[in-house]
């Protein structure tokens, strides 16, 4: 049996998950990362994407996150998300609304740096939309 560790997924609204899991795949800013028990300590940024939680017996659950940070230790992983929801609860209209808000930010950007960051975030959101909600 695979070793487990404590995984917590926290958003500003609530604690979405806190339990023992076998592994978690997170969308790190430097690329996808699989976290398992006894992982080397690291802190990483999280980009918009899907978190896959694998429980004992290979049961899986997925969450959508819209940025944040993960604190990974040998004993566990705490992911503080800017916003998060279960994939099965994701609303196409809500995601489309978020994309339109970011498009407006791109259009209203007053400087190059702000526009570049908004365009990058918009690209991540539209990629996420295509992966999760095919037309």
Swiss-Prot record:
It is a peripheral membrane protein. InterPro entries: ATP_synth_F1_dsu/esu, ATP_synth_F1_dsu/esu_N, ATPsynth_dsu/esu_N. One of its GO terms (molecular function) is ATP binding. The keyword Cell membrane applies. Keywords: ATP synthesis, Cell inner membrane, Cell membrane, CF(1), Hydrogen ion transport, Ion transport, Membrane, Transport. Signal peptide: none annotated. GO terms for cellular component: plasma membrane; proton-transporting ATP synthase complex. Its main location: membrane. It is found in: Cell inner membrane. Pfam families: ATP-synt_DE_N. Produces ATP from ADP in the presence of a proton gradient across the membrane. PANTHER family: ATP SYNTHASE DELTA/EPSILON CHAIN, ATP SYNTHASE EPSILON CHAIN, CHLOROPLASTIC. Belongs to the ATPase epsilon chain family. F-type ATPases have 2 components, CF(1) - the catalytic core - and CF(0) - the membrane proton channel. CF(1) has five subunits: alpha(3), beta(3), gamma(1), delta(1), epsilon(1). CF(0) has three main subunits: a, b and c. This is ATP synthase epsilon chain. The gene is atpC.
């Amino acid at each position: 049996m695979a070793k487990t560790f404590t995984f917590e997924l926290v958003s500003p609204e609530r604690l979405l998950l806190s339990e023992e899991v076998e592994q978690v795949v997170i969308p790190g800013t430097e690329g996808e990362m699989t976290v398992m028990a006894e992982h080397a300590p690291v802190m990483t940024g999280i980009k918009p994407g899907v978190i896959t939680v694998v429980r004992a017996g290979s049961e899986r659950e997925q969450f959508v996150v819209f940025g944040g940070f993960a604190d990974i230790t040998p004993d566990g992983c705490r992911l503080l998300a800017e916003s998060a929801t279960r994939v099965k609860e994701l609303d196409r209209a809500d995601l489309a609304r978020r994309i339109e808000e970011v498009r407006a930010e791109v259009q209203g950007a007053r400087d190059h740096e702000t526009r570049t960051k908004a365009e990058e975030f918009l690209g991540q959101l539209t990629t996420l939309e295509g992966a999760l909600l095919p037309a």
